[in-house]
Design a protein with these regions (language model features):
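Sec-dependent signal peptide cleavage junction
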Residues: 24-41
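Intrinsically disordered, low-complexity Pro/Gly/Ser/Thr-rich segments with frequent PxxP/GP/PP motifs
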Residues: 105-131, 192-221
Length: 233
């Protein structure tokens, strides 16, 4: 019982870190949101996929050039160490930290909100340049947390419309929604989520029946983003 209690407390703590992080990323500018990379990752064909456990796999290693989105700044980088991952489980991965260690040093990657069958391109947290995957023999997924209840878009109550840098949130429930409505979104194109980061934007104070509220979503773009889940009271 003590072990289970400890695991629940750790999961809550990790989740708190996630939501604090995505809250900070909400305040970045629209200009940064529009600087999506047009350079596809260069995958090293010599590497094999890695089973990290619980249905999470590294499916590729390689280098990435383009906008560095992991810290929300979206400045341009060249030749950064990247990995591609896939969730083959039946649950959405809420958060996890992938660590690769070995003779080449330590490479760190973070991932959040990866749904079943979802694929993501993750960039090394310290912007390490990629040379080879051979020097990273130990590969682990740490602090993994899966959603206990699968997240939804609250589609029976909320309708979401997107513009570059903005989101339109409509109450379609026919009743007043008390409390905040929070929209979580990620970079997405060509079948991949780009970056482990999840952004959020919130409607504060609830919504009247039929009310439409436009909110700032600095990293959202019509062509390069997708809403992954919504929380509503």
């Amino acid at each position: 019982m003590k072990k289970a209690s400890h695991e629940r407390l750790r999961a809550v703590a990790v989740a708190a870190v996630i939501f604090a992080a995505v809250a900070v990323m909400t305040y970045a500018t629209v200009r940064n949101s529009q600087r999506h990379s047009e350079v596809m990752p260069d995958t090293d064909k010599k590497t094999a996929e890695v089973d990290l456990g619980d249905g999470i796999f590294i499916t590729g290693f390689g280098r990435y050039s383009g906008a560095y989105m992991e810290d929300g700044k979206n400045d341009t980088v060249t030749g950064i160490f990247m990995i591609t991952v896939e969730n083959r489980s039946e649950k959405t991965l809420q958060y996890g930290e992938i660590t690769l260690t070995g003779s080449a040093g330590t490479a760190e990657f973070s991932i959040s909100t990866l749904p079943p069958k979802g694929k993501a391109v993750l960039l090394e947290k310290n912007r390490m340049e990629y040379r080879s995957a051979d020097g990273f023999a130990d590969r682990r997924l740490n602090n993994r947390v899966f959603f206990e209840t699968e997240p939804t878009l609250c589609g029976d109550r909320i309708k979401i419309g997107g513009l570059d840098g903005k989101l339109n949130v409509t109450n379609i429930s026919g009743k007043k929604i008390e409390g905040d409505v929070t929209v979580f979104y990620k970079n997405f194109r060509d079948g991949y989520y780009y970056g482990g980061i999840t952004y959020r934007a919130a409607v504060n104070g609830g919504l009247e029946p039929g009310e439409v509220r436009q909110i700032n979503a600095g990293h959202f773009s019509v062509k390069g983003s997708t809403v992954v889940f919504v929380t509503c009271p």
